Each structure stands twice: as C-alpha cells, then as structure tokens.
Amino acid sequence: ANASVATTGGAYSVFQNAASSLFSHNLFEVGFSYSPWMRDVKKGYDLMAFGGFYSFNHKHSISFGTRFYREPKLNPDDEEYPFIPKDENNNPIVGIEAFRPLSVSADLAYSYRIGRYLGLSVTARYIRSSYGELFTNNALGFDVAAYARIPLNRMLEGAWVSAGAKISDFGFTFDDSNYDLPTKF
C-alpha cells in the first residue's frame, strides 16, 4: 500500500521509484527540502533531503539523493530513552556523554526505458545510523523497481494511468548487528 511507487517522476523519485524519472517532462531536476519534523511533540527533530536526476533523452537516467535525520540531544539520564545502557542499580553507565542520534543515507540509481511505456531501475543505498558512542550501524541496501505509464487516449484525450512495483531494502549490514534490513515489496 505504498502509492508513491506509481507517482510521476521528480527530483525525489530516487527515494520511491527511480524509473519514474524516465517519464518526467524534464531532462534534469534537483530539489532540497528541510522539515523540523515532529516539532509539536518535541523540538530538535530535523529531516532533510536532497535529490535529483539527469535523463539522457528519456532512455537512460542517473538519479541521486541523500537524506539526513537527526533527533534531539539525549542525556544519559533521560528516562524516555530506554536503550541508554544502565548498571544494575538502573543508573546510566559512567562515561557516556550526551549525544544527538543521527541517520544518513546516500542513494544512487540507474534507470532504463524499455519501449514507450515501461521503465526499470536499480538503486544502491548506503545507510549509517549513529547513537553517539553507544552504537553505530552501517548498511548497504538495494531496490529494484518498475514503472509503467500508459496513455488513455481512446477514452480521455491527454490522460494516462501509471503503475509501479518495487522490491526495496534488500542488502546487508557491515557491523556486528542484530538488525536486518526490512526488505519489502
């Protein structure tokens, strides 16, 4: 139930379905967004994205993007963050300093158009999540996607329908981690 895999291509299509960039009216797009995320809950959450693509005559395209997510500063004695290590008396382990959790991803995709109505893409994504000195996770994930845009000229002049499919986040982690990438279709 992720409708964004079938939306029209744009600067941020690398994050949803890079093949859709082949059907954009533009040969080049770039975009930047910043959102002070969840500011009604607690200040300090930042979400930024930078993305774009370059299409070679709507037959091949290269897409790129990076996302940056930062949480508020955490102190070792914060009660609302149970993952901070505690000793047997439930006190924060000495030596842990305040930190600000950070997640960064960098995406690079190649897309190829097959015929007039179908495009395919493959995306590689490097992901790094850091929780100060506590732990850091690094992963490499891949997406494979298809995007189809079919005109409905016989019924409605100038109208079209689009469909998309994607297998995302299959890959591996680099670190000794108990976490796996959440592969989904």
For each of these PLM feature ranges, what is it?
Residues 1-185:
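Subset of outer-membrane beta-barrel
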